[in-house]
Structure formats: structure tokens, C-alpha cells
Amino acid sequence: MEAVYTPEQMRYIDAHSGVDVAVLIRRAGYAVAQTALRMLGGSYGKHVIVLAGKGNNGEDGRVASDFLRARGVKVSVFSSSEMPTQLPECDLVIDAVYGTGLRSDFVAPTTKAPVLAVDIPSGIDATTGECRGVPLRANETITFGG
């Protein structure tokens, strides 16, 4: 893994960007939704599961879920506190649990669906690149900043 910015540098950039955090989250959520639609190949009859953490990464996922619903996608959102060990069948999983804010080990739920990670797959330490627990294996990762 080659770091472009450390998590601390990204927090500094976000805090000093001059853009309200709600605007940044809305922009990120829209970009996540657009990437998800591309990965799905459309919206008709599709089911997406969003795994949403407590912080801004989780908010990115929740905002993406609103955009996807507006496009007709069936969306199920699981908060980090109610995440099952085995995910129901779906067409895509959006991993918005931790992002760069991982502080402890993470055991990902199992899924056969492709995974879109927001910032970095949950369970991977953004500073060291090391696995912390059992991370989700992302098919694609979308990140923002710089």
C-alpha cells in the first residue's frame, strides 16, 4: 500500500477545506451512489446493502442509500451495531463502516456479492495497511480528498 495522505492529514484537509462537512458528505454520498449504479449496471430490480458506521464514513453510505432509493434501487442499511454475520442475498454491498477511522479489529460479515468500499475496506488500517481482524474484500474502493 502506498499512502497518498495519512488519516491525520485527511482529517486536517477536511477540517480546513472551507467547505461545510455536510456538503462534503453529500458530495461523497452522490459519488458512492454513482459508482454503485455503474457497478450494478443499472437500477431496475437491484438490491444493495449498505453497512454504515457511526462516523462520517457511515454518513457517506446513508446519503448514498438515499440517492440509490431515488433511482429505484431496493436498499437495506445495517448499522455497525446491528450487522449480521451473514448478509442476505443482494447485488452489491457498500462498505461504509470505518473508512480511515478504524480503531479496533473488525470481523466482516460474509457475502457473495461484490463490495464497494468507501475510503478503504473496513478492517484495514489506513496508516499501516495491515489487516485488523477479518476485513471485507472490496471489488472497488472509492475515496475522496486532496
What does each model-found stretch correspond to?
Residues 1-45:
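Positively charged, low-complexity intrinsically disordered leader regions
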